[in-house]
Amino acid sequence: MADLNNNLLSPNGKNIALTKTENFQSNPIQISKIIELGDIKVGYLMYNQFTLGFDDDLNEVFSNLKAEGISELVLDLRYNGGGLVSSAINLSVMITGQFDNEKFASFIYNQKVMNVYNSDEELKSRLNLNFTNQLGDGSTINSLNLNKVYIITSNRSASASELVINGLSPYIDVVQVGDNTYGKNVGGPAAVYDYIDNEGNKNPEHTYAIKPITFYIANGDGFYEYA
């Protein structure tokens, strides 16, 4: 350690040992609490990323909010730059719950790709992302059945965060508070890593990957022009 005096660092003889935590993953559920305003119970949730592996934790948070009988929800997405589309849908269902199997969002590709999808009913159904009442593991989603949600945003709120706002807008009253969001209304498949061969061997000389942008993502009304 060192002391700072007059913008100069001088060793102070103190040593601190740090232990590295393997495979550490930050919990995106930053804050969850209930604010009582007279007779009204308001739930407040700061959620910072739509991350794999935290949908169960988020579902438990909504179970607690539901048990406490909140009637209003403030969702803080100021620091949420996006993540998994599936998690964005799950969060949206936790807020609502009354729109099971309705269209939440849909993919819009270029015309050649759309022609392929539209040529077959089964393929065409893959373009739509619907509200569901279950998580991926089959467990029931805890829903608040709200008709209004307040969402706090910043210019760092992007992608899946914007999908929640846009996807819910045709169904409930979404009150956006704060700055305009980033404006990422597109997506694509997982990055193409050509340095990994079919046997899983890596070529260390390959240092670039391709992440193609292949689709817009629209809400149930077909709107996606918010970039």
Identify the residue ranges that each predicted region occupies:
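C-terminal, low-ordered peptide segments at domain boundaries
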Residues: M1-I70
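C-terminal "post-core" interaction segments
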Residues: D39-L45, Q49-E72, G81-A227
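Short strand-turn motif at the edge of the Rossmann-like AdoMet-binding core
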Residues: R78
